[in-house]
């Protein structure tokens, strides 16, 4: 009787690949009044490292501006993880790398943004959860339309 190989999905390591904060108008910006406009951009990516091991990145860029022109701060974090995937069909692996892994990484990126911004002297930035499944579906549809 042949032994069926069990699927493996595990987190091997979580780490901050890149973290930067710019406060271009300090210290004057701290004296200005007004409610900042906060813009967030998120991107994801993955790469195969070796058999069964993948690196996944979630990059979050947060920009806060006063009066839609003066930048209060620009914060960027790339939260990464090394994941082990074995005995998983390719289409399922793509879904894990595009949805499950970013869902695991995003709370760490969110905490890094909030902590960095707070340590810079600003009120914390609370980022809303991201629907990585919807983003993945949009990417799949765009690739299918382009093929």
From Swiss-Prot:
Keyword Kinase tagged: no
Biological processes annotated in GO: protein folding; protein tetramerization; protein transport
Top-level taxon of the source organism: Bacteria
InterPro entries reported in the protein's UniProt record: SecB, SecB-like_sf
Keywords of the record: Chaperone, Cytoplasm, Protein transport, Translocation, Transport
One Pfam family recorded for the sequence: SecB
CC terms in the record's Gene Ontology section: cytoplasm
UniProt keyword Chaperone, yes or no: yes
Major location (coarse): cytoplasm
Localization annotation: Cytoplasm
Any one GO molecular function term: unfolded protein binding
Protein family membership: Belongs to the SecB family.
Described function: One of the proteins required for the normal export of preproteins out of the cell cytoplasm. It is a molecular chaperone that binds to a subset of precursor proteins, maintaining them in a translocation-competent state. It also specifically binds to its receptor SecA.
Record note on quaternary structure: Homotetramer, a dimer of dimers. One homotetramer interacts with 1 SecA dimer.
Name of the protein: Protein-export protein SecB
UniProt source species: Neisseria meningitidis serogroup B (strain ATCC BAA-335 / MC58)
Name of the gene this protein is made from: secB
